[in-house]
């Protein structure tokens, strides 16, 4: 079901939530302790490499990047790869590049590894970066084997700057969903989609209109997908089985559908690009 022009105009003019309740959320619990060990291991490994290739999600180009890379920028050539460009709304790509350049990042590339978009540009860029470094000579770069790749596990920053940044990272699948809460994540996703007028979920799930109430949306999703469950209810005449929507299952589908790009491309850092800091900054 597609939104008619009138319905789309009505949705765009609707008064959506201006903020998302963030108080009382334990962000530290979302990021497992083993990542601290991973950071130490990565830091020791960095001494062995000639160039750092940092891979980050293009939907959050400004949020959640590891400060470890910032500390090593002056010592090692550095390339930032913003992957999953096919899932990101890159309307503001020029502003993203300008923002990153203001942070000292001049070597940035957007990629889509699934369709091999721009991926083949990485090795030539790395070769050029190493060749430009005063520590290396061009002939050393061209010897066989051309280069060795030292892969490291994905490790987040030891401290997340805000609850909202943590939610963005969670939406991109950086942490296990159950640590944050699937229904909480689904609500934040709905809030974000409506706020930025991305109404692809209405069309995908065949809803009558855009909605800002996550319970109503998940109920419609559950009914459409047949995700229901029997629940026993105690009444004056005994136990009665009733059928009710399986909200957790609907929330999981909502999140997975977003991550596959079926709800349309989204830029989760749009507010940051426009100069608005993430909400509920941690002390």
Describe the role of every protein-language-model region:
Residues 2-52, 59-79, 85, 91, ...:
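Helix-rich effector regions associated with P-loop NTPase G domains
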Residues 77-79, 85-140, 245:
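Canonical P-loop GTPase G-domain recognition
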């Amino acid at each position: 079901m597609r939104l008619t022009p009138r319905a789309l105009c009505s949705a765009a003019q609707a008064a959506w939530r201006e903020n998302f309740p963030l108080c009382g959320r334990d962000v530290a619990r979302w990021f497992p302790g083993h990542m601290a060990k991973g950071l130490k291991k990565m830091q020791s490994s960095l001494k062995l490499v000639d160039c750092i290739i940092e891979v980050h999600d293009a939907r959050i180009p400004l949020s959640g990047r590891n400060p470890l890379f910032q500390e090593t920028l002056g010592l090692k050539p550095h390339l930032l790869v913003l992957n999953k460009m096919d899932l990101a709304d890159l309307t503001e790509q020029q502003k993203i590049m300008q923002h990153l350049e203001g942070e000292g990042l001049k070597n940035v590339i957007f990629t889509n590894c699934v369709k091999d978009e721009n991926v083949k540009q990485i090795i030539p860029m790395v070769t050029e970066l190493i060749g430009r470094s005063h520590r290396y000579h061009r002939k050393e770069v061209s010897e066989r084997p051309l280069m060795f790749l030292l892969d490291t596990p994905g490790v987040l920053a030891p401290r997340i700057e805000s609850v909202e940044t943590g939610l963005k990272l969670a939406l991109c699948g950086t942490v296990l969903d159950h640590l944050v809460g699937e229904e909480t994540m689904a609500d934040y996703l709905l809030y974000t989609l409506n706020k930025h007028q991305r109404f692809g979920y209405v069309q995908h799930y065949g809803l009558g209109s855009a909605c800002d109430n996550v319970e109503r949306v998940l109920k419609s999703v559950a009914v459409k997908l047949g995700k229901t469950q029997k629940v026993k209810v105690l009444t004056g005449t005994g136990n009665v089985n009733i059928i009710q929507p399986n909200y957790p299952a609907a929330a999981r589908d909502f999140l997975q559908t977003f991550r596959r790009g079926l709800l349309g491309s989204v830029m989760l850092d749009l507010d940051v690009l426009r100069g608005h800091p993430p909400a509920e900054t941690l002390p």
